[in-house]
Regions:
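Trp/Phe/Arg-rich N-terminal binding region typifying the photolyase-homology
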Residues: 1-76, 80, 86, 90-106, ...
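Active-site-proximal binding-pocket segments
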Residues: 48, 53-56, 61, 67-243
């Protein structure tokens, strides 16, 4: 399985999936046949999470091939990412609290052997060990496997969900603050309070085609408890009527200018914003940073090929731009911070 960092390759992957595999998606999507056999799922999330292709584009193309009735499950899965972004955007303190808790837990668990065994793939669980290695090597995991992984981390290994979410963010090509953080909260039972997700031996065996044996899990754990509640915070954004001749900021989660509402406007300059590890609260692996770098450079080249004045700059350099700017706002997470 290979993720080539360009919009052209992303569109090719989307078209190939729709033409060849979408018809069987609803029936086969829960099966993880291993990293060498991913034809039953789209593997588009590393591109969607960076805006290289967006959710509307994916849905529109799928509906040109199949009716909504035949396509409903795929569309639902695509829209979960949109839902999570909207949910967290209206509750930004969930992200801020997560980072605060994470800082405390890092210090508490930096020498914890159970934690070190988990992130190094040295537990007694064959399936978990393989998934750790797969995550580090391919920077991707099947969605069903992510749920099993998180459940084992929280309820069998009894490790804090916050550290597990960080581990995913560090290594996943498609990691984003909303889907990742809220997904881990959901498994733990604090996103939908009292409702958690418990991995089970029979379920893992069934949906991995019996690739793993002797899966001894805690299948009777209770949900985690959080007394925190979050109120909605209304966000005010201005959509200026006249945006020509202004500078545009594009962050790493909205990289494809050609599919934005601004594609026909004439900007003075477009700045593609890159976020290095030294500016991030959660440090990413070198492979993930490299993937983001190549995606950003691909978009830069596309803009230049269309004679658009553009430049890649570090997020810390935004303050040096003195002319008027507008932005494809980053919604949530590291870029918004």
């Amino acid at each position: 399985m290979k993720f080539e960092p360009s919009r052209a390759k992303a569109v090719d992957k989307l078209n190939h999936f729709i033409e060849n595999n979408l018809s069987e998606y609803s029936k086969l999507r829960n099966f993880d046949f291993g990293p060498d056999n991913r034809s039953n799922i789209s593997c588009l999330s590393p591109y969607i999470s960076h805006g290289i292709i967006n959710e509307l584009e994916v849905i529109d193309k799928s509906l040109k091939k199949f009716s909504f009735a035949k396509n409903e499950k795929f569309i639902q899965e695509v829209l979960w990412r949109v839902y999570w972004k909207g949910w967290l955007e209206l509750r930004p303190n969930v992200w801020l609290d997560y980072l605060m808790e994470l800082n405390i837990l890092r210090d508490q668990f930096k020498s914890n052997q159970n934690y070190l065994n988990a992130i190094e793939g040295k537990t007694d669980l064959e399936c978990f060990t393989q998934w750790v290695n797969e995550l580090k090597e391919t920077n991707y995991l099947h969605n069903h496997t992510r749920m099993w992984f998180a459940s084992i981390w929280i309820f069998t290994l009894e490790l804090p969900w916050q550290l597990g979410a960080e581990f995913f963010m560090k290594h996943l090509y498609d990691g984003d603050a909303a889907s990742n953080t809220l997904g881990w909260r959901w498994v733990a039972g604090i996103q939908t309070k009292g409702k958690h997700y418990l991995a089970s031996e029979w379920n893992i065996k069934k949906f991995t085609d019996n690739r793993f044996k002797n899966i001894k899990l805690n299948e009777n754990a209770s949900p985690k408890i959080s007394k925190k509640s979050y109120t909605l915070i209304k966000r005010e954004f201005n959509n200026p009527q006249n945006i020509d001749k202004k500078n545009l900021l594009i962050f790493e989660n909205n990289l494809s200018f050609e599919i934005t509402d601004f594609k026909n406007n004439k900007f003075k300059k477009i700045y593609l914003i890159f976020n290095k590890n030294e500016n991030r609260s959660i440090k990413l692996s070198e492979k993930v940073l490299e993937f983001k770098t190549f995606l950003t450079k691909d978009q830069e080249q596309t803009l230049k090929n269309n004679s658009i004045n553009c430049e890649v700059i570090d997020i810390s350099e935004i303050k040096n731009i003195t002319d008027q700017i507008i932005a494809l706002y980053p919604t949530v997470g590291e870029n918004l911070d």
